[in-house]
Amino acid sequence: MKNRKLAVAGLLGAGLLLAACGTSGSGSSSAPPGAQGFTPPTLEPLGQLGQPEGALNVLAWPGYAENGANDPKVNWVTPFEQETGCKVNVKPFGTSDEAVNLMKTGDYDVVSASGDASLRLVASGDVEPVNTSLVPNYADVYGFLKNKPWNSVNNVSYGVPHGWGANLLTWRTDKVTPPPNSWSVMFDQNSPYKGKVIAYDSPIYIADAALYLQKHQPELGIKDPYALDDKQFKAAVDLLKQQRPLVNEYWSDYLKESQALKNGDGVVGTAWQVTVNLTKSEGAPVESVLPTEGATGWSDTWMVSAKSKHKTCAYKWMNHIISPKVNAQVAEYFGEAPGNAKACAETTDKKHCDTYHAGDAEFAKKISYWTTPIAQCLDGRTDVKCKDYGEWTRAWTEIKG
């Protein structure tokens, strides 16, 4: 639970290949599920499993591939090795940008990619489509996580959903009254909590501002907070510049945010459920809510390297990691909702899935999951260009000053 220690200020690099990839997609209702707006390289998924190759190189967020080294009681790698004969080498990474760069080396077979990295990996040809029929446990993954813009392109799956969560509005109950249910407490320039706001430190946070504007300035026409044309992007950036005097701290490590909430340096902010749980467990009076405007969030996907020399082991790993028992172990240790619907029966804390809204499709619908912004608008528009992540990164530098 205490292992999403992510220094994610530089979630994506400026060298975004997506802007140059293919043609723009259609916004019609007949458009296939998944991402639109670019054409990935033509790569074929694995046709059938062979003999396990005896090795597997795993690139993972800390806490996703535990072998007992950090905690002897937390180990789902060794059972996999014993079951398959695939010797696992784990390389943890700290940011999505780091993961993307490491995947380019071809040294890794599988990667746990967040939505802000997955499309880059697809567009560059560093990962290939996944034959989900070779992953039996895929059948039990929640339907609302399948064939989404961050893990599929034109109805072709590029990975196996693993876990997910929302970026929640969080506050100290002894300092913030009445209980807020809107992001306005963080964005309104007249907020009574000036100098006490905690905001996420990443260019992807521009999407949070866009989501707020989508509801509060509908005349901007924002349909997707990751698909912003010039006017929409300027409005989101201006809102974040207006917010800057309200902010006490920009956080990229949830432990530091928890500390700020505990000591009162910050009284309201955006946080993960694991942050709320930890802060509460250490005595601070905090609560959280998914606001009326909705929220941004993440859904992580296991993807297979196009250069992998151990593809049978890779597929066996994906099936293992989303099996009910293991998916439950990872979700509890990492601090997120599991992707496998049957995992909830396997959690040690029987309230875990309720706390994290694991099977709550309506809750999930309110989340705008991290996705890589590209020049071809992800909302299907073809008459304008949208701002790509390189421009988001430059704007974030200006916002923070």
Q: What are the residue ranges of the model-derived segments?
A:
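Conserved C-terminal helix/tail region of periplasmic/extracytoplasmic solute-binding proteins
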Residues: 366-401
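Extracytoplasmic ligand-binding site segments that recognize negatively charged/polar headgroups
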Residues: 56-73, 107, 112-260
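A bilobed periplasmic-binding-protein/Venus flytrap-type ligand-binding module shared by bacterial periplasmic
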Residues: 168-175, 211-213, 298-311, 329-333
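Periplasmic-binding protein-like
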Residues: 137-140, 237-243, 282-306
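C-terminal motif of bacterial Sec signal peptides marking the signal peptidase cleavage site
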Residues: 17-20
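A ligand-binding cleft/hinge motif common to bilobed small-molecule-binding domains
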Residues: 117-120, 270-285
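Mature extracytoplasmic/periplasmic domains
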Residues: 305-373
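Early extracytoplasmic/lumenal segment of secretory-pathway proteins
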Residues: 22, 36-120
